[in-house]
């Protein structure tokens, strides 16, 4: 029920019409002719064509004004979705992708609190990407809503549960101490954070990998006679 404002003959009776249906009357200001009127009943969903007429004190009625076309949209957009499936990341500003009503404004929430960060869904496909401000290490529930051009807000999407971990594992330690060996495929024991993937190198060449359970054992491929500089990295 929008407020309609206009001007008419001073002191005249202004009638608001939606097509042929009357939506009420008001009196134009006796000096300025300015009037405001609120429809006496709610406008129907969709396109409405509003006009006004003015009737003077002796009953003469003007022709109708030019039409004001108003589209009423009280229907909220469909619930948007998040298509990103990443649950663990070392990116503190992960890019979130999904689908929302085409052309709608997508708003990002973290743990149910709006971030104020928005983006516009593609006008044809509804695809969107949105990125939060930098997140601290920890677990989060990310959701989005879609707002259409009429201001209707959708229900929140299903939550994406995501854990941010930007902390590198502790430095692995090679526990095996073999300065000299006759074994051309030596077994190397490495101490590393449980669950981390340990990669064994010799002069930059990968010799093998394994998953640590505090310790991990890696047997090298066949090595020729010579000196080797053995190192290890751990990736969580």
Model-derived features: positions:
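Structural beta-strand segments of beta-rich domains
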Residues: 2-4, 92-96, 184-188
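Short proline/glycine-enriched turn/loop motifs at strand-loop junctions of beta-rich domains
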Residues: 7-13, 99-105, 191-197
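Short strand-edge motifs at loop-to-beta-strand transitions and within beta-strands
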Residues: 33-37, 126-130, 214-218
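Surface-exposed, short loops/turns at beta-strand junctions within beta-sandwich domains
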Residues: 39-47, 131-139, 219-229
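Short, solvent-exposed loop/linker segments at the N-terminal edge
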Residues: 86-92, 178-184
